[in-house]
Amino acid sequence: MIDSARRVLATALSAVLLLGTLAGCANGSGTTQNAKSTDGAATSETTASAIKRGESHDPSIVKANGKYYIFGSHRAWLKSDDLINWTPFTNNLSTDYEKIFSGIWDGWAKQSSNPDVKGNMWAPDVMWNKDMKKWCMYMSINGANYRSVIVLLTADDIEGDWTYVGPVVYSGFEKVNAAKTDVWKVLGEGADLTRYASQTDTGINAIDPCVKTDDNGDIWMTFGSWFGGMWMFKLDPKTGLRDYGTTYQTVPNQSDAYYGVKLGGGFGNSGEGSYLLHTNGYWYLFASYGNLQQTGGYQIRMFRSDKITGPYVDEAGNTAVSTRAIGNNWQSDIGIRLMSSIQWSGNDNANIEVAQGHNSALVDDDGTVYLVYHTRFSGTGEKHEVRVHELLPTDDGWLVAAPYEYTGTKAADTKYTSKDVTGDYELVTHEQNTSFKGPKKVNEKNSTDYRGVNKPVSITLNDDGTVGGDKTGTWKLDKSDGTGDVTITLGDVTYHGAFDKLPRDKDGKDVMTFSALGGNVCVWGSQK
């Protein structure tokens, strides 16, 4: 998202969350209204579903000691026993952040246009470092004009307390202030820094870290920002900081001597919140396009590679790395869009998900893969909550998101026959050029006649393998391994995906669904 918009929204969210904390203390039930605690985290339990919701912007998921933990922007910490119900928790970062970050904030990121650290602790990622025998938290400390830094903190317990270690990577530097960073250490004293002011080259914001270990045991950190692309370099496993022994060449659209390997984006195109996941024989790169606001078009795009360093491509072979400016690239066909704003019978259409993004993902102990993201809603302005969907593998090596929220039913729990899945379905296509824009009539605030949402057509999966209805074609259930793998051909596009019987978001009714990918576009089906 645009940096200034993010700062303004962060300030507003902090104020709202603070008020929510006071309100939560006054109401002990937490059932029909938000019961908020901690600065940045909140939960609410709805009477309809009895799910204890969690609020955490830019949620990063990690599992430890049999529990699931989310670490988000603005010190929004959540934990869960089941990936469904979330409880906030606190540590020293919740209250002592000004003292903990005073050195790096005052010495680098603080500026007159951005004087308060409170709304500028963004998108942490947490991992266990087996060499250090510590939990390592990588957090963005955001400054104006891209003068930001990603720092490392460590803890013996994943819930904290946390100890500040030091900076990992800087942005927004120039010759007059480079001595405050590690730039001369990496590039050599007096190196030419001209290209670091260019958004078409390497003028990035050092935000949104993601830290992963590859098959060789090497630790890599991805990071980066909207305009200037997403990058990665190797970390030293003994310190958790940058590995200064590994160097990189400066090659346009491929790598940079300071920022390392280029993974995606650049040339002023949106692309942030990079997240890597290794499963199914591939490395998958997730990135968020668009602006994070309710009507900003925020969305998750996916690419994959055989190697952690890329190159990452989508199903059509488009590279994640931009080589030119693309106006409103969140409306482009580059990258697989996992989900969009939709209206169908399985949703509460007065409050549909919008601006879904900044995800993380988890391969659980049993091999189930989950997508974790924040979403806003059509009827609640900039309020956001965490959502979790299962990610299903396709027979051609991609991942697709299950159509409904994970509430305890796993796709792997049941094998399906043709008799189980034939019937009438609503079919939604996650068009890449659509995004929620509010009611068609702006003055009708409660209208559900929205602009920029995807609506279903009707199809029938017949028992003879044909598809009838608004779209026609053929379908086939793979019975060779007893899984729910499906191939559907509609027109000249063949989709590969999986069936999954799930409770609908709207009312909990169990229905057969499918999620599939073809022609670089995802589709969802939900039985009527």
Region locations from a protein language model:
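Carbohydrate-active catalytic/glycan-binding domains of CAZyme proteins
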Residues: N27-K528
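Bacterial N-terminal signal peptides that target proteins for export
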Residues: M1-A12
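Enrichment for repetitive, rod-forming helical segments
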Residues: L13-S14, W344
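C-terminal motif of bacterial Sec signal peptides marking the signal peptidase cleavage site
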Residues: G20-G24
